[in-house]
Amino acid sequence: MPEDVFKALADPTRRHILDELADRNGQSLFEIRARLATKHGLGMSRQAISQHLAVLEAAELVRTRRQGRYKFHDLNTAPLERIATRWLRTDAAEENQ
């Protein structure tokens, strides 16, 4: 599981997508595409962004929900929190001494 998170975070485009979802959750593919183009100068196809979103979903960093014909994407910080907690736990540091 952490390997999927690190793989997802390794790509700068996926980090931009996560930044955009952190700024405004619940975006459609069209909205994400427009924000990447205007704010980051990334003119990408819908298919390319969909592939990036699929990697983020596999790592559980993004959750999707459907409303009618539309699919909305939300940031899920739980995988990052699990990794950070594991590394920052004070009892884990004491065990290693």
Q: Which residues make up each language-model segment?
A:
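N-terminal helix-turn-helix DNA-binding core of bacterial DNA-binding proteins
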Residues: 7-8, 12-45, 70-80
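Compositionally biased, intrinsically disordered low-complexity regions used as flexible
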Residues: 4-5, 57
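Hydrophobic transmembrane alpha-helix bundles
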Residues: 65-70, 84-87
